[in-house]
Amino acid sequence: MKKLTFEIRSPAHQQNAIHAVQQILPDPTKPIVVTIQERNRSLDQNRKLWACLGDVSRQVEWHGRWLDAESWKCVFTAALKQQDVVPNLAGNGFVVIGQSTSRMRVGEFAELLELIQAFGTERGVKWSDEARLALEWKARWGDRAA
């Protein structure tokens, strides 16, 4: 069976999803999994994230070091998700155990942007046009954002 995904935005979309499930013939030897979840973050949200991370990476020194955008992403997601660290295999450093932003739901992603905005604003970050648009988007749409 091929994978089906329904984005439910209206009663018509909901009925399409219900109809698709009703067409499945149950087979105890081949169970089918149906998952209902909030949509994951979009490519547009991801672009906005990297604009904000880029601004922070160019303007904020962290404990005497300048971090790249990827490192800042790890710092912010670890703070948001209260992640843990474990020693690396060589025993000469640590690895953050955490969540990938690509698996975040829209609401979680909005929280991440809010955290970055608060952190950057506290430290006087001057937001680029793209980052400013991302933060305005978050303020306007919050958890409902596409």
UniProtKB/Swiss-Prot annotation:
Alphabetical list of InterPro entries matching this protein: NinB_sf, Recombinase_NinB
Disulfide bonds: none
Domain of life from the UniProt record: Viruses
Database matches in Gene3D superfamilies: NinB (1.10.3790.10)
Pfam family, any one: NinB
Family: Belongs to the ninB family.
UniProt-recorded name of the protein: Protein ninB
Species: Escherichia phage lambda
This protein's encoding gene: ninB
